Amino acid sequence: MVLMIVSGRSGSGKSVALRALEDMGFYCVDNLPVDLLPELAKTLAERDAAAAAVSIDVRNMPESPEIFEKALESLPAEYSPQLLFLDADRNTLIRRYSDTRRLHPLSTKNLSLEMAIDTESDLLEPLRSRADLIIDTSEMSVHELAEMLRTRLLGKRERELTMVFESFGFKHGIPIDADYVFDVRFLPNPHWDPKLRPMTGLDRPVAAFLDRHTEVHNFIYQTRSYLELWLPMLETNNRSYLTVAIGCTGGKHRSVYVAEQLADYFRSRGKNVQSRHRTLEKRK
């Protein structure tokens, strides 16, 4: 099991790194006192956590490096600690603090920002010197840092993107969480068949009705082709979800069928897919 210890100078991106690690499946704890590391690791080992990450900053640094080393030696045998240290040049840190107007953790000790940054560097040097990976974030954006961590730790640039296909009825309103909205009200409507009206797009007779129409096939094919074309770009855009909303008049027949067809297609391509049907969920 991996225990990633994230440290670095304030303003270098520790919070960004911790969020990126959480997206990668790490159990994350922010600002954990060093002497609690063994206890946390033991608890996570009992819960079969595959990977964990903790951040340590200047506020919870031990008084001597020996305390940190002792904490690492006390970790359960199944944990492999790795130390990630984030840094940035002095001018970049000053600019970031100026932009965010936040106080440096050591500014409470009546130090100027410049002196606080320099003092922090000295206090964190024992951690920096034993780091397994040092990343200089001076020229990085938030997204670039997250991307680098995924590349270094997972061997891939994109995070696991979850595609969500949801059906809805326009008469109930457009979902506010949708990234893409497709209108299928022009497709043949099973509602006008008295036998199909009580059914939904999940029922075989409705699916058979829609499957007989060429325009339905063409719409599904062109929609999935559009999504396939841009999916690689979306996967590298630092997002966790892509929500595709399919709407018909009532959200009961056409939109449900089309959403399921698209979900099945991308699921068969190995994508992480969810489907939901807003109108049908309201009826339960």
Swiss-Prot record:
PANTHER family in the record, alphabetically?
A: RNASE ADAPTER PROTEIN RAPZ
Question: Subunit composition?
Answer: Homotrimer.
Q: Name the species this protein comes from.
A: Proteus mirabilis (strain HI4320)
GO MF annotation terms? ATP binding; GTP binding; RNA binding
Which family, according to UniProt?
Belongs to the RapZ-like family. RapZ subfamily.
Q: What role is this protein assigned?
A: Modulates the synthesis of GlmS, by affecting the processing and stability of the regulatory small RNA GlmZ. When glucosamine-6-phosphate (GlcN6P) concentrations are high in the cell, RapZ binds GlmZ and targets it to cleavage by RNase E. Consequently, GlmZ is inactivated and unable to activate GlmS synthesis. Under low GlcN6P concentrations, RapZ is sequestered and inactivated by an other regulatory small RNA, GlmY, preventing GlmZ degradation and leading to synthesis of GlmS.
Pfam family name, one: PapZ_C
User: Which annotated residues bind ATP?
Assistant: G8, R9, S10, G11, S12, G13, K14, S15
RNA-binding: region residues: 267-284
Q: Kindly give the InterPro entries that the UniProt entry links to this protein.
A: P-loop_NTPase, RapZ-like, RapZ-like_N, RapZ_C
Chain sites annotated for binding GTP: D57, V58, R59, N60
UniProt-recorded name of the protein:
RNase adapter protein RapZ
Protein keywords: ATP-binding, GTP-binding, Nucleotide-binding, RNA-binding
